[in-house]
Amino acid sequence: MNVLKTKEEIIKTILNEENILIVQDLDGVCIPLVQDPLKRKIDKEYVEDVSKLRDKFSVLTCGEHEGRRGVNRLVEKALNSTTKAKENGFYLPGLAACGVEFQDRFSNSSYPGLNDNEINFLGKVPKMMRLMLTKELKKFLPNLSNETRTKLVDVAVCDTRFTPTLNFNEIFSYVKYDFNKVKDLQLIMEKIMNNLLEDSKSIGLENSFHLHLMPNLGLRNGREIMKYATQNEFGTTDIQFIINGAIKEAGLLLILNKYISEKTGVYPFGANFNVRNAPK
């Protein structure tokens, strides 16, 4: 039995295999976890090595490819260039946003399962979050300076393209762990996100999105239950605005469907398969 000793030998062995596909998650795997997602880093050597695997490598992540918080920005930082990845195919191919943002090595993107109305609405959500949160904080914490309020809102609104999120950790800390106030702030957070959900329904997107609370107390009538603050813990700190059907398990089926079609010319789950019509 031959033992592969070098990275080059391993890459060559993978390339020589006719039917092999490596599917890898990103955050916590090849991107170390950090408190501030904007400070994440990816290793240059990793980026260059996986590009050599071509169609035998794919990522599958609930992070995102594009946008200021996207992995594509980390790749560009690692290469110290905003053009090298595009020119040489160094972007990480595969599915992001839990299965609805697909790209190749050159960052050519598609959004299987999403329609233009959903994409357009998602693009407006962070601004709507900011406006509603600013209004609520003016009432709830009237003594805040404009500068402090703006900073708290900036940190709270996570403007990811397909999973816009409210994170109230910083605001909870600002009220100095007054758990009655924290609970009131949780109600504000829930109110804002429910308003967004109702706004989406009012323009015909009633089956497009749901709210994901972190942490939560399970489901009631199909919706996640808020974990309210106690003297011992904050409870729910984040609420994400999530696309229905966007889960990694379904995304894996989509990746396999594409891979098999490229090898055989046949889509086992159908040419129009996406996470929205995957088995539940």
PLM feature segments, named:
Residues 6-9, 42-45, 251:
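Well-ordered alpha-helical segments embedded in enzymatic catalytic cores
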Residues 145-280:
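Conserved acidic, metal-coordinating active-site core of Asp-based
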Residues 3-4, 39-43, 245:
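A conditional alpha-helix N-cap/helix-loop micro-motif detector
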Residues 13-39, 59-60, 94, 252:
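Asp-based phosphoryl-transfer active-site loop
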Residues 1-14:
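N- or domain-start disorder-to-order transition segments that initiate the globular core
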Residues 34, 68-74, 105-106, 168, ...:
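A short acidic (Asp/Glu
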Residues 22-29, 94-107, 159-171, 231-234:
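Short loop/turn segments at strand-loop or loop-helix junctions that form parts
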Residues 40-161:
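Active-site phosphate-binding/coordination module
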